[in-house]
Amino acid sequence: MARYLVLAVALLLAACSSTQKKPLADDPFYAPVYPEAPPTKIAATGSIYQDSQASSLYSDIRAHKVGDIITIVLKESTQAKKSAGNQIKKGSDMSLDPIFAGGSNVSIGGVPIDLRYKDSMNTKRESDADQSNSLDGSISANVMQVLNNGSLVIRGEKWISINNGDEFIRVTGLVRSQDIKPDNTIDSTRMANARIQYSGTGTFADAQKVGWLSQFFMSDWWPF
């Protein structure tokens, strides 16, 4: 019996444990893309000025091709609130008046037959959930792909090493070239299919995780 009990506890602990892999700083999915341009042949003219290395004072510095860098200004703010409630009432009432027969009450053992029954049930449940988050900052990302309509697929990450762990920001999404500002920045709210992840690894991050016992009480395995 004890063997089956230990096996059941082990299965519950395995079900409550998290299987999410820890993020890696060198994830190839977020590896930068470097533009591969063919070498430009520079003709020897004897002059210091070269047309191939010149740039116009009025040229557009905004990202527009694969390998370019763009800065995303994080301006994320979310707030969600949900409340629910229900109330169930149920009641029943039944009575049986004394029975008269022959001008007198029918009794059993001298006790008149008189039956009364009353039952009631009242169940009330309420739940509230309120959550708000905000994220401000900036991160530079690479242009990974240029679509036919001119939209840019961007992706990038930033890792910051602190005493007892690392913090990282990862971002990926789709932006329109028209939404990029002249200083080569774009607000995160202008990104489509945005995936923004801000988290950490190490001692501080592990301290914020919920323990296995608390996970069990909050999981579907808890019967109450």
Curated annotation (Swiss-Prot):
<dbReference type="GO" id="GO:0003774">
    <property type="term" value="F:cytoskeletal motor activity"/>
</dbReference>
<dbReference type="Pfam" id="PF02107">
    <property type="entry name" value="FlgH"/>
</dbReference>
<keyword id="KW-0564">Palmitate</keyword>
<keyword id="KW-0472">Membrane</keyword>
<feature type="signal peptide">
    <location>
        <begin position="1"/>
        <end position="15"/>
    </location>
</feature>
<dbReference type="GO" id="GO:0009279">
    <property type="term" value="C:cell outer membrane"/>
</dbReference>
<feature type="lipid moiety-binding region" description="S-diacylglycerol cysteine">
    <location>
        <position position="16"/>
    </location>
</feature>
<keyword id="KW-0998">Cell outer membrane</keyword>
<keyword id="KW-0975">Bacterial flagellum</keyword>
<protein>
    <recommendedName>
        <fullName>Flagellar L-ring protein</fullName>
    </recommendedName>
</protein>
<dbReference type="InterPro" id="IPR000527">
    <property type="entry name" value="Flag_Lring"/>
</dbReference>
<feature type="lipid moiety-binding region" description="N-palmitoyl cysteine">
    <location>
        <position position="16"/>
    </location>
</feature>
<comment type="subunit">
    <text>The basal body constitutes a major portion of the flagellar organelle and consists of four rings (L,P,S, and M) mounted on a central rod.</text>
</comment>
<comment type="similarity">
    <text>Belongs to the FlgH family.</text>
</comment>
<keyword id="KW-0732">Signal</keyword>
<dbReference type="GO" id="GO:0071973">
    <property type="term" value="P:bacterial-type flagellum-dependent cell motility"/>
</dbReference>
<comment type="function">
    <text>Assembles around the rod to form the L-ring and probably protects the motor/basal body from shearing forces during rotation.</text>
</comment>
<dbReference type="GO" id="GO:0009427">
    <property type="term" value="C:bacterial-type flagellum basal body, distal rod, L ring"/>
</dbReference>
<keyword id="KW-0449">Lipoprotein</keyword>
